[in-house]
Amino acid sequence: MIGKVLNRQDLKQIAFDQVAWVLGKNPFASSTMYGEGHNYHPLYVAFSPQLVGALPVGIKTLGHHDIPYWPTINNAVFKEIWGHTTGKYLWILADL
């Protein structure tokens, strides 16, 4: 993490803010991580139960509009669990 390398608190704070965003401090007031944070929703899993700590592949947009959109419906397009998403999140936490 560049904030750690450069010893810059402002850059470290950006990383902390991004972690908070994932866990519910976002325009949706909803955690994107299943089972953790505030107001989390089920994620799409085809062959397993919901996995606590899993993160979805991304955030959906509302058509061609650049507005916050995180519907409660469960869909493989934006709420599917991919291992790399959760892995990268854990990597960031290790650096903080």
Model-derived segments and their meaning:
Residues 1-96:
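Aromatic (Trp/Tyr) and acidic
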